[in-house]
Amino acid sequence: MKHFLEISQLSSEQIESLLQRALYFKHTKQYPSYSQSIIANLFYENSTRTRISFELAERHLAMSVVNLDLQTSSEIKGEAIEDTIRTLAAMGIQYFVIRHKQDGLQQNLANKLGDTVHIINAGDGTHAHPSQAILDMVTIIEQKKRLDKLKIAILGNIKHSRVANSFQCICSKLGVGDLVLISPEIWQPSQVHFGRVTDNLNEGLEGADVVICLRVQRERLLEDDHLDLDFYRNNFALTQKSLSYAKPDAMVMHPGPMNRGVEIDSEVADGNQSCILQQVTNGVYARMAILESLIAS
């Protein structure tokens, strides 16, 4: 694996290998050392979980880590991102973790620069967030062993969610039994990669084994008069009442950051069924598996 860009570019066998390797790291705490490998983290969008998770993964693997401060870099002077990467590669940096608001940017960089560097997609616009899909599936298979028997519900702004896009792809690759995308009509995707769409919250949650709640992007609500926060809260929030339609042992997940009292209530986020912090923990091990796969190949 030369780059890690999209779930759709991986085989089911590659995905299974990443999942099992992540669990191996978690349970054994036995980590290989890649002290000769140098990696740079370039985050052109704000991030807490993904950025720190990748950095911890890199340090667990004994990689040399460079965190580029974009506020003091030549990007402020107008330098193109491909020139930044070429410059860093000339200094000996081989691996680049990149988050950017532009859809497809990491794929374009891989096409232009792929002979000399390895690109890891840490999120591109509304397009893809493949490492989130891996860590989410690691979290699920820890508790639910038969993916083909599961009903998974993902709730929120599906249309603009890179998390939802990548998760649909990984469910398709691994043969998840039933994936339901729950969203108000205006947030429903124009293209469904896998699963079925509904705007009926209770119907979508009925009998679900896993419920994934997405963040409501308040900045997008303010820009669009058609989106009403109170309407969303009243009809699509994950509350104790709405969660009761899912199975009693249903897992509750959220990629973060959460808007408590908007898309999810605190008693759900902090309740016995919540696996949100488990996702954060597994994110480090999932990203270790991804990085190792790139280095080893």
Swiss-Prot record:
Swiss-Prot/TrEMBL GO biological process terms: 'de novo' pyrimidine nucleobase biosynthetic process; 'de novo' UMP biosynthetic process; amino acid metabolic process
GO MF terms on file? amino acid binding; aspartate carbamoyltransferase activity
Gene3D superfamilies per the UniProt record, alphabetical: Aspartate/ornithine carbamoyltransferase
EC number, UniProt record: 2.1.3.2
PANTHER family in the record, alphabetically? ASPARTATE CARBAMOYLTRANSFERASE (PTHR45753:SF6), ORNITHINE CARBAMOYLTRANSFERASE, MITOCHONDRIAL (PTHR45753)
Q: Give TM segment ranges.
A: none
Q: Which InterPro entries match?
A: Asp/Orn_carbamoyltranf_P-bd, Asp/Orn_carbamoylTrfase, Asp/Orn_carbamoylTrfase_sf, Asp_carbamoyltransf, Asp_carbamoyltransf_Asp/Orn-bd
Q: State the oligomer form and interacting partners.
A: Heterododecamer (2C3:3R2) of six catalytic PyrB chains organized as two trimers (C3), and six regulatory PyrI chains organized as three dimers (R2).
* Enzyme class name: transferase
Species of origin: Legionella pneumophila (strain Paris)
Pfam families reported in the protein's UniProt record:
OTCace, OTCace_N
Amino-acid positions noted as binding carbamoyl phosphate in the UniProt annotation, renumbered to this chain:
49-50, 99, 129, 132, 256-257
In this chain, L-aspartate is annotated as bound at 77, 162, 215
The function of this protein is: Catalyzes the condensation of carbamoyl phosphate and aspartate to form carbamoyl aspartate and inorganic phosphate, the committed step in the de novo pyrimidine nucleotide biosynthesis pathway.
Q: Which reaction does it catalyse?
A: carbamoyl phosphate + L-aspartate = N-carbamoyl-L-aspartate + phosphate + H(+)
Pathway stated in the Swiss-Prot or TrEMBL entry: Pyrimidine metabolism; UMP biosynthesis via de novo pathway; (S)-dihydroorotate from bicarbonate: step 2/3
Q: Name one GO cellular component term.
A: cytosol
- The coding gene here is pyrB
Keywords, sorted A to Z:
Pyrimidine biosynthesis, Transferase
**Descriptive protein name:** Aspartate carbamoyltransferase catalytic subunit
Q: Which family does it belong to?
A: Belongs to the aspartate/ornithine carbamoyltransferase superfamily. ATCase family.
